């Protein structure tokens, strides 16, 4: 395993269902996504996490292309957070890419803010467990989000991204305002936007992390086998919608 990467495999005895490659954002070690990796791998996905894509975008892009080529089983879904979303979109726009679909989170259309480290933790997540991770200087560069994206990481034209895209974005994201991301996603050939009320920038690790992970699982399963038909009924004695 290449230094800095983390891998989470399916449970022993389970048949792997898909390969997910998670691309971390500005200043993030792969360990920032340990909780997400464990949760998704428990559902029999093979998950590989790539650290801070901004450290060396050209090298990281080549690394991820290799991971995509070697991934087994298909489908290969790339999950990007912050700057990782930009790289994911760029890779999916390349001719001949094996990427079957994307999940993008906190897409930074507006690429820099001016704020101190303490305020950035507040802006990133309301989850107390994740805030402990954010305070770890070995896992997160506290001021990385105040830096602009490297020149190599610019959004591709939406027309060049033809794979399905699940975009997850917090409505309270002050690092990357949802309005800018919405306008980009609206131009995608096959995009869907999951808006998270009250959600902050680290939407994969915010207080709604369980629901967000479940949304990703449903998206990948739909990609694999089609939209499920699930009938939900309530006993006659239960008033589902009380007046």
Describe the function of each predicted region.
Residues 27-30, 50-75:
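Catalytic nucleophile-loop/oxyanion-hole region of alpha/beta-hydrolase
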Residues 139-158:
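Active-site nucleophile elbow and catalytic-triad environment of alpha/beta-hydrolase enzymes
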Residues 36, 163, 177-186:
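Short alpha-helix in the alpha/beta-hydrolase fold that links the catalytic acid
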Residues 68, 72-120:
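Primarily recognizes the serine-hydrolase "nucleophile elbow" in alpha/beta-hydrolase
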Residues 2-55:
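Short, surface-exposed "cap/lid" segments of acyl-processing enzymes
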Residues 171-176, 201:
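Acidic catalytic loop of the alpha/beta-hydrolase fold
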Residues 192, 197-243:
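Catalytic active-site module of serine/aspartate enzymes centered on a nucleophile-bearing elbow/loop
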Residues 160-161, 167-169, 173:
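Short beta-strand/loop motif that positions the catalytic acidic residue
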């Amino acid at each position: 395993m290449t230094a800095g990467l983390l891998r989470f495999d399916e449970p022993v005895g389970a048949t792997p269902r898909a390969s997910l490659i998670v691309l971390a954002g500005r200043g993030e070690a792969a360990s920032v996504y340990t909780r997400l990796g464990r949760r998704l791998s428990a559902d029999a996905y093979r998950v590989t996490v790539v650290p801070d894509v901004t450290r060396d975008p050209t090298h990281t892009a080549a690394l991820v292309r290799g991971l995509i080529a070697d991934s087994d089983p298909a489908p290969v879904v790339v999950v990007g957070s912050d700057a990782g979303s930009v790289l994911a979109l760029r890779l999916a726009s390349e001719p001949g890419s094996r990427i079957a679909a994307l999940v993008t989170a906190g897409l930074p259309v507006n690429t820099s803010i001016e704020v101190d480290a303490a305020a950035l933790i507040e802006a990133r997540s309301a989850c107390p467990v994740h805030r402990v991770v954010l305070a770890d200087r070995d896992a997160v560069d506290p001021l990385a989000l105040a830096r602009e994206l490297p020149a190599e990481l610019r959004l591709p034209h939406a027309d060049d991204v033809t794979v399905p895209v699940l975009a997850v974005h917090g409505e309270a994201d002050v690092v990357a305002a949802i309005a800018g991301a919405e306008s980009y996603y609206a131009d995608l050939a096959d995009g869907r936007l999951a808006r998270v009320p009250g959600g902050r920038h680290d939407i994969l690790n915010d207080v709604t992390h369980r629901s967000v992970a479940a949304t990703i699982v449903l998206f990948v399963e739909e990609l694999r086998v089609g939209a499920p038909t699930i009938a939900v009924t309530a006993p006659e004695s239960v008033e589902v919608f009380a007046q």
